[in-house]
């Protein structure tokens, strides 16, 4: 007997990717339901070789559904996730709505799988921010060996992190530039085509943006509350794939060679680090891939026990959809949930 799975936000970038990955990985699902708002009702989405008709979230009964993959934004999640959880269905939420709730585990399976047992408090599990997910996958194995004191990260985040509207705006603006049409910025605060924008999410009182704060807060929650983290988040004209320049200061000595060996053996990490032209990974090459790619590992001569590295991953997969499905797999593989239809 398989599990009954509902995907909320099935017509969005991440929702569609969730359906793709459920099929690709052969998740033990007896039934998969595609859900979205009333305006998307009847829309068709792909699930493996099948076509699913999108149903209206408002009319759906979760009482016999085992897992809900929620990717419809924070407002929808705040309204629906507690209701769904109260019906006995486990919600794996991709928004920021529940990440900082003390009763909701924030999970990256390669980093803090044991924390998942706390899901029973509310039947909600939070997926981290896309840029945080790949960062902690790369940091965790190094922290286990040499203990991280401080992290300075600059992110170079693709437009798909802003949804389909962000991807459409980059395409439309790029075309407009080439044909000398006026360029209009709607989704982003400034033109994104052939430009970079040092601003993602709302500004906070201290001058940081909410996106930058998320990286700090989530890294501390999942990895170690004592780690100091500072971040600058930048939107770049790339369709898929987030990149990060990461500077790390450790309490204990660690060399670049040691770091390479550690990361090569670490789950979810793939080291591509040759000191030659093209001996590194860019977001173009990581699109559609599951791994967190790590390149440019080198020692920082300006600080004791310091390293620099370049971290790249597909933000729609490890940064969102893949991590959510890995959480669902963790629930199943550890026997934390059973198919309700079989009960």
Annotate the PLM regions:
Residues 39, 240-243, 288:
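A short, glycine/Asx- and small/polar-enriched loop/turn
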Residues 119-126, 195-206, 309-311:
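Helix-loop-beta segment of a Rossmann-like dinucleotide-binding subdomain
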Residues 234-237, 313-318:
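Glycine-rich phosphate/pyrophosphate-binding beta-alpha loops
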Residues 1-192, 228, 256, 261, ...:
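N-terminal Rossmann-like NAD(P) cofactor-binding subdomain of oxidoreductases
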Residues 123-134, 207-216, 319-323:
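A glycine-rich, Thr/Ser-enriched phosphate-binding loop motif common to dinucleotide/cofactor-binding enzymes
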Residues 193-239:
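Oxyanion-binding "anion nests"
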Residues 231-232, 237-267:
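Internal helical hairpin/lid segments
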Residues 253-287:
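Terminal hydrophobic/aromatic helix or amphipathic segment near a protein terminus
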């Amino acid at each position: 007997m398989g599990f009954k799975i509902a995907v909320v936000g099935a017509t969005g970038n991440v929702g569609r990717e969730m359906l793709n990955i459920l099929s690709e990985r052969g998740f033990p699902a007896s039934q998969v339901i595609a859900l979205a708002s009333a305006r998307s009702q009847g829309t068709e989405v792909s699930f493996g070789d099948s076509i699913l008709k999108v149903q209206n979230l408002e009319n759906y009964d979760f009482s016999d559904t085992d897992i809900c993959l929620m990717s419809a934004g924070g407002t929808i999640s705040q309204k629906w996730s507690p209701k769904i959880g109260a019906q006995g269905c486990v919600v794996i939420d991709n928004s920021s709505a529940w990440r900082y709730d003390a009763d909701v585990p924030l999970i990256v399976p390669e980093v803090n799988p044991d924390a998942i047992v706390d899901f029973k408090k509310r039947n909600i599990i939070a997926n981290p921010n896309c840029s945080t997910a790949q960062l902690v996958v790369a940091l965790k194995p190094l922290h286990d060996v040499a203990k991280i004191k401080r992290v300075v990260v600059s992110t170079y985040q693709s437009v798909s992190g802003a949804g389909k509207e962000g991807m459409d705006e980059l395409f439309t603006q790029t075309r407009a530039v080439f044909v000398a049409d006026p360029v209009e910025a709607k989704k982003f605060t400034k033109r994104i085509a052939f430009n970079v924008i040092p601003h993602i999410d709302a500004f906070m009182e201290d001058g940081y943006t909410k996106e930058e704060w998320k990286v700090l807060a989530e890294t501390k929650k999942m990895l170690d509350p004592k780690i100091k983290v500072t971040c600058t988040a930048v939107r770049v004209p790339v369709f898929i794939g987030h990149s990060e320049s990461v500077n790390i200061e450790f309490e204990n000595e660690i060399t670049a060679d040691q770091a390479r060996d550690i990361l090569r053996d670490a789950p979810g990490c793939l080291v591509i680090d040759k000191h030659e032209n093209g001996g590194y990974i860019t977001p173009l090459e990581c699109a559609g891939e599951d791994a967190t790619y790590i390149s440019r590992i080198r020692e920082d001569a300006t600080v004791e026990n310091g390293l620099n590295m370049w971290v790249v991953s597909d933000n729609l997969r490890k940064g969102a959809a893949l991590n959510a499905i890995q959480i669902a797999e963790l629930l199943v593989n550890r026997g934390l949930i059973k198919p309700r239809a079989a009960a």
